[in-house]
Structures are given as C-alpha cells and as structure tokens.
UniProtKB/Swiss-Prot annotation:
Keywords: Virulence. InterPro entries: RgpF (IPR007739). This is Virulence protein VirA. Could be involved in the biosynthesis of a major surface antigen important for virulence. It comes from the Bacteria.
Length: 304
C-alpha cells in the first residue's frame, strides 16, 4: 500500500507514544476508530458500554486517547482491541488521524469494507441499537445547518468496498494541518468540511437521522411537549427549535432516541446548554427499565 507521506502524516506518526494490541486483527471486515478523552479514571467506565455496542456490530475497535497516565492496562483491555496513546493535538480529529494511520499499516487492511469514526461525547446505548451504518459510500449519523451544512463528527463512516482509502487519507493528511491546538481551525478544516469534501469527490452521501426528519417528529409531538409546568419556557424552546438552526444531539435528542439511537450527549446531561425544559425528568422517562435508570443515575453521579 502507498502511504501518504505528507508533513501532517510525519508529524502525527512522531506523536504516537505507544500502541497496545489486546486482540489480533485477523482480517476483520469492520473497523471502528474510537476517539476518547478522560479527565479521571471514573469517567472511563462508560466506554465499556460503547465498546460492547461496537463489538456486537462486528467492529474491531481501535481506541485512541491523548496521554493521561490515569488508566491501567486492565481498564483499557475492556474497552478496545487496540489502544493508541498519543500527544494531545487536533482534538477528536487528531485521534481519528492517529487511528487512521494504524489502519493503513494493518496487514490485510485492503479487506476492510466498513470504516467507522466515533468519539466518546455520548453515553449509551440505553437499549437496542443496530442502526450504525448505511449502504452509502459515506454516511453521518446526524447533520446540522449550524454555521453551514455539515455532518456531525461524533459518528460517521465509509463503505470501503466502494471508497478507496486514499480519498480518506487525503482528507486527513493532505489538507489543512491537523497538528494544531487551534480548535476553531480544526472545526473549520475538518468537521465543517467533511460533507463538502467527500460530496465534492463524488461519493454517494447519506444521513441516518436527517435533521429535517427529526424536526418533523418534533413538530408532530407539539401537544405532548407544550404543557404545564414550565409552559412559557417550553413555548420559547419550541419556537427556537422551529425557527433556528439547531444541534440535533441537544435540542432533538429525544427524537433521536425514539428513532433508534438510544444515546445521550455528555455535554447535554452535564450542562444542558440549550435549556431543554425538564431535561432530567424526561431522560428518566425514556430510560424505561429500572436497570437503565439506575445505571444512568450512577453514571451521572460519578462521571458528569
């Protein structure tokens, strides 16, 4: 295989601190690059649920994290097949790029037919979820019109039966420098450019949960949403969702949940940045079983 020997490739290669393989690749057809970041050991516990979800969908999981020094090998082996520790740069896309380098170097990588990029910004699944990929050449889980139309970068993937890995390499290694601490630059050059770049290359693109569908679901549920108590704040929130470009993982998380993506964003639970009315009450309602409710409360108490 021809590797993209660009300046970005060389910088990222030199920034990799260690690679630990817990399970052999053995010609897996699906690979997930799982980007993580933890501030303390307790925060790492919920990764196991996401890892099991990926494994249950037949993915070989490469976990990439900046150096922290707080995790033991006994923790890591429960959450991935391969662990890559790296210097901290480029935010999530720095981890995605490190994982992609590893994929390029795997013996037998030409037989991979699905490549998934996923980060740890959400918790779950809390329930059954097998809608993780699409038959398109490039897909995202959700899209957004904030700033400009783009696919959100917490979960996206490629069908490598139809897409040459070189196109993905070029996106990561032959464009804007990913070796940076400038968050706005990373967002502009990578997240906001994902759809634009690959659509421009002629790839057939799709979204598993389009924002237009989620908004339509939200409108249909108006009478269930706008009710006492907190009627005024609910009306204001409703108008905001209908009239503005919103983040579907924040304002439309419930519609996502009901559409078969039973995950919740950490930031939403921790900060409720959009002022979702009665958020925690609604989360407990949709959890359903006592097991999920108890686990959610424990995660919230210990990790958020």
């Amino acid at each position: 295989m021809k590797y993209p020997r660009s300046l970005s490739w060389e910088k990222i290669s030199s920034s990799t601190i260690s690679i630990r393989e817990f399970n052999r690749f053995e010609n897996k057809k699906k690979v997930a690059i799982f980007c993580g970041y933890v501030r303390d050991k307790y925060e790492f516990n919920y990764h196991d649920r996401t890892y099991q979800w990926l494994r249950n969908n037949d993915y070989y999981v490469i976990l990439v994290m900046p150096k922290s020094g707080i995790l033991l090998e006994s923790d890591l082996c429960k959450a991935c097949d391969v662990f890559i520790e790296r210097e901290n740069f480029g935010y999530d896309f720095g981890s995605y790029a490190c994982g992609l380098q590893y994929v390029n170097l795997i013996e037998g990588s030409e037989r991979i037919d699905r490549l998934l990029f996923v980060n740890d910004s959400f918790i779950g699944p809390f329930g059954y979820c097998n809608l993780i990929e699409d038959s398109s050449e490039f897909w995202g889980n959700t899209d957004s019109n904030q700033v400009k139309y783009h696919y959100q970068s917490y979960l996206f993937g490629f069908n490598l039966e139809k897409v040459n890995l070189d196109i993905i390499n070029n996106f990561f290694f032959s464009r804007g420098d990913i070796y940076t601490d400038d968050k706005s630059l990373v967002i502009e050059n990578f997240e906001l450019s994902l759809y634009e770049y690959f659509n421009g290359k002629g790839l057939r693109c799709s979204v598993l949960h389009p924002i237009s569908v989620l908004k339509s679901d939200f409108i249909k549920q108006t009478f269930h949403f706008i009710s006492y108590p907190y009627l005024t704040s609910k009306i204001f929130f409703y108008i905001m969702v209908i009239a503005r470009d919103v983040n579907p993982t924040h304002q439309l998380w419930l519609q996502l949940f009901k559409r078969g993506f039973p995950f919740i964003k950490k930031e939403l639970l921790r900060d409720n940045p959009t002022g979702y009315p009665e958020l925690y009450k609604k989360v407990e309602e949709v959890m359903g079983s006592n097991d999920f409710n108890g686990e959610y409360k424990q995660i919230f108490k210990n990790h958020l």
